[in-house]
């Protein structure tokens, strides 16, 4: 459940499992079921619409504000509004499963269904969300803290969600004939010694090498070439535009709706002109078509195949979702992350720490800020480091590794 960045790795994994002869059913928020089905996956709708929520007035307010407490309040309120319907839908899908795989937002429910069916549960994470001393909770703070405080931030987040959600969870458990849970899924799953697949690269976070086989860092789960071809997301004329000039800088905000598209397009165009580069702008979930500038050096696309297009670019500026970050780094692009919330701040700090990018908050977005952060990345040092990192990332076979872990859990 979540934005496309949350869903696409699951779709890639489901496709790989199906190619191995497994029957796979994926429960998704209703707004992304069509995307998954076009990619050849048996996707079923859950009673939640992430796009509607993010584009609602309340969703827009907390996205624009960047306040973590407001984010938590809205997330908890929206979760409580939809969770009973989501639980019902998930229960209908889980019967007869040999294994249940769940992402962070529905981990409580997914692990409960695995317990009900008496089958293994595997978590699928896009950032280090289990308590650890290396990194703080990506929700609670964007700061690097001493190890005890890093662990404490995870406990704070766990307890906040547990206080707000344990009654709904235990009502769900009772409907399945299970006893009440007395601790959050983080605590229960860690004690049970289960496996959490970390769908990000060890080359980005070498500090977590000590997590071992229970939390393997497999890398980014990417769509197969067949899935990318089936989706056919490149717009007509894009390849010709790319070939007609110098490699552009990519600008995109993915599933984060842009509140003032005309203003944002104008400041991107201004920044690109000052940088002396062409601009490829991915509209994502924002409606920018009515504001497209009449400028041959600026191209706005509603959809695009990131794996196919980004290697033709010179640098990337985006919101810092785990999927977008993995895609731009895999393409060898120095990357500026203009973060909105959650793990986006974390990935922004990561690219800066690795010397392959820079970061600032979306609330600070301006043409001047874009020029100041992007210009140094177009020089040799950051570009060379980004290319070297891409070479290391290319050696990972994340999807096959994840499939092997799942098959091993079922044996």
Model-derived segments and their meaning:
Residues 82-151, 203-204:
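Conserved nucleotide-sugar donor-interacting segment of glycosyltransferase catalytic cores
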Residues 42, 46-99, 169:
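Phosphate/nucleotide-donor binding subsite
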Residues 14, 200-315:
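Donor-nucleotide binding loops and adjacent catalytic segments primarily
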Residues 32-34, 50-54, 123, 127-134, ...:
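Short gly/pro/ser/thr-enriched loop/turn and capping motifs at secondary-structure boundaries
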Residues 53-58, 131-138, 226-231, 310-312, ...:
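Short, charged, surface-exposed secondary-structure boundary motifs
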Residues 95-96, 192, 311-312:
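Alpha-helix C-terminal capping/helix-to-coil transition sites in glycosyltransferase folds
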Residues 1-25, 31-40, 71, 100, ...:
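Nucleotide-activated sugar donor-binding and catalytic core shared by glycosyltransferases
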Residues 23-29, 278-283:
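Short internal beta-strands
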């Amino acid at each position: 459940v979540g934005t496309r960045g949350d869903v696409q790795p699951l779709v890639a994994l489901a496709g790989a499992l199906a190619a191995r002869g497994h029957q796979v059913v994926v429960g998704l928020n209703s707004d992304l079921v069509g995307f998954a089905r076009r990619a050849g996956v048996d996707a079923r709708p859950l009673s939640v619409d992430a796009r509607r929520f993010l584009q609602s007035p309340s969703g827009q307010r907390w996205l624009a504000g960047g306040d973590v407490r407001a984010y938590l309040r809205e997330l908890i309120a929206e979760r409580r509004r939809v969770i009973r319907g989501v639980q019902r839908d998930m229960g209908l899908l889980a019967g007869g499963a040999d294994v249940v795989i769940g992402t962070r937002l529905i981990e409580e429910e997914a692990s409960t269904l695995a317990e009900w069916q008496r089958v293994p549960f595997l978590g699928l994470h896009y950032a280090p969300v289990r308590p650890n001393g290396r990194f703080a909770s990506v929700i609670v703070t964007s700061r690097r803290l001493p190890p005890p405080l890093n662990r404490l931030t995870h406990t704070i987040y766990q307890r906040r969600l547990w206080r707000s959600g344990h009654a709904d969870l235990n009502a769900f458990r009772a409907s399945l004939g299970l006893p009440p849970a007395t601790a959050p899924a983080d605590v229960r799953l860690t004690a049970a010694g289960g496996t959490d697949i970390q769908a990000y690269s060890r080359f980005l976070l070498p500090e977590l090498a000590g997590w071992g086989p229970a939390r393997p860092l497999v890398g980014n789960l990417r769509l197969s070439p067949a899935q990318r071809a089936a989706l056919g997301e490149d717009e007509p004329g894009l390849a010709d535009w790319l070939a007609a000039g110098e490699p552009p800088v990519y600008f995109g905000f993915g599933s984060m709706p842009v509140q003032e598209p005309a203003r944002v397009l104008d400041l991107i165009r201004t920044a690109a002109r000052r940088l002396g580069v062409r601009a490829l702008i991915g509209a994502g979930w924002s409606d920018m078509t009515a504001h497209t500038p009449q400028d041959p050096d600026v191209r706005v696309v509603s959809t695009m195949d990131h794996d196919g297009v980004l290697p033709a670019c010179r640098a990337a500026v985006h919101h810092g979702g785990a999927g977008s970050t993995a895609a731009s780094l895999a393409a060898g692009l120095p990357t500026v992350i203009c973060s909105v919330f959650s793990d986006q701040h974390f990935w922004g700090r990561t690219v800066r720490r690795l010397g392959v990018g820079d970061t600032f908050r979306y609330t600070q977005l301006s043409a001047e800020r874009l020029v100041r952060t992007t210009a140094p990345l177009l020089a040799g040092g950051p570009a060379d480091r980004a290319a070297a990192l891409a070479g290391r990332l290319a050696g990972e076979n994340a999807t096959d590794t994840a499939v092997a872990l799942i098959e091993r859990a079922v044996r």
